[in-house]
């Protein structure tokens, strides 16, 4: 099966939904490919307090759901699929969504970023068995247990604070002595009596894959070199994200960490292909900036379609 579109949007987080809303209102009938993590990072978060327009805050999943409904109201079409290959060498661009082929005059890449893992020898074997990158998804399973959160940024503070709802004790382990988290989120975590901080410490491995559950960690103090075991029932990672851009390798420019390179805000090196949100933004990475760049990409698509037609 094959079809031809004015615009396809890859990703359904803040940037993708906003691009969908704007291109739908421009009557371009966008197709949104939802991807592996529908709703993006906001769907895995709790209360969002810094998205303007919600004085009491709004739950992340609710915010993205609202955005989607708003885009759908103007005719955006959402498809549960993911991009398996892409050819940007000529227009219309060719996308494969599994066995399904889509040609499109323009492409908006809003594929976001996914959780980073530590790369421990037994980490992958224990995902879903006590190793997690999503406190909101998995916190509930550790009611009354002692757990560990890794990281020193806002994600780690947010996860640690959230997990105190369930856990009897949360140990936040960070590889340095200072934190990159915002002052307000760090202070909130520091004031929480259930959160204990372990700094200058790295995780070397997680036990015990033979039991199919997390029983403890092998830790190393980077200052003293001491290596020791630390009992815990869960390991939550809050160590940032990696951009979902591998599929465009060789066709679009990337920086050293794999973020798509853009000029004039959202233009890639291929005319008619735009990138927005966390897949191209290593600096701001906020819901509101992702939404803003989704709007920019949509306006560029409108201009492109006016100039080049179908
Ligand atoms: P981040 O700011 O990049 O922080 C990642 C943390 O993980 C850093 O402390 C880093 O340590 C640590 N880390 C990275 N790789 C590691 C490794 N291999 N081993 C051990 N530690 C490692 O990422 P983020 O916390 O996800 O935040 C990303 C952006 O989203 C930020 O702009 C943040 O403000 C925003 N955010 C906002 C909210 C909110 O406002 N509600 C919530 C979450 C995130 P180093 O410090 O040593 O590099």
Explain the meaning of each model-derived region.
Residues 71-90, 95-97, 101-103, 165-263, ...:
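A Rossmann-like FAD-binding core segment of flavoenzymes
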Residues 78-140:
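Glycine/small-residue-rich loop that forms an oxyanion/phosphate-binding "nest" at active or ligand-binding sites
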Residues 13-14, 37, 113-115, 154-155, ...:
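Residue-level detector of alpha-helix initiation sites
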Residues 5-74, 145-146, 157-183, 255:
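Beta1-alpha1 glycine-rich phosphate/pyrophosphate-binding loop at the start
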């Amino acid at each position: 099966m094959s079809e031809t579109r004015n615009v396809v949007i890859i990703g359904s987080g803040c940037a993708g939904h906003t691009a969908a809303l704007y291109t739908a209102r421009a009557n371009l009938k966008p197709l949104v490919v939802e991807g592996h993590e529908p709703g993006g990072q906001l769907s895995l978060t709790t209360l969002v307090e810094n998205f303007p327009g919600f004085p009491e805050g709004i739950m992340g999943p609710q915010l993205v759901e609202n955005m989607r409904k708003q885009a759908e109201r103007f005719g955006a079409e959402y498809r549960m699929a993911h991009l398996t290959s892409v050819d940007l060498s000529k227009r219309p661009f060719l996308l494969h969504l599994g066995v399904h082929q889509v040609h499109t005059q323009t492409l908006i890449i809003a594929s976001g970023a996914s959780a980073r893992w530590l790369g421990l020898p037994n980490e992958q074997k224990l995902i879903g068995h006590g190793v997690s990158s999503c406190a909101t998804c998995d916190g509930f399973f550790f009611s009354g247990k002692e757990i560990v959160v890794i990281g020193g940024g806002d994600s780690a503070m947010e996860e640690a604070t959230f997990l105190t709802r369930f856990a009897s004790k949360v140990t936040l382990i960070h590889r340095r002595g200072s934190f990159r988290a915002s002052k307000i989120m760090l202070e909130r975590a520091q004031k929480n009596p259930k959160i204990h901080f372990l700094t200058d410490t790295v995780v070397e491995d997680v036990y015990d894959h033979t039991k199919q559950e997390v029983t403890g960690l092998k830790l190393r103090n980077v200052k003293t070199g001491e290596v020791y075991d630390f009992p815990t029932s869960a390991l939550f990672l809050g160590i940032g994200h990696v951009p979902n851009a591998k599929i465009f390798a060789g066709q679009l420019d990337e920086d050293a960490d794999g973020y798509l390179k853009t000029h004039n805000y959202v233009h890639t090196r291929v005319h008619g292909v735009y990138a927005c949100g966390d897949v191209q933004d290593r600096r701001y990475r906020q819901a509101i900036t992702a939404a803003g760049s989704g709007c920019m990409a949509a306006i560029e698509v409108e201009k492109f379609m006016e100039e080049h037609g179908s």
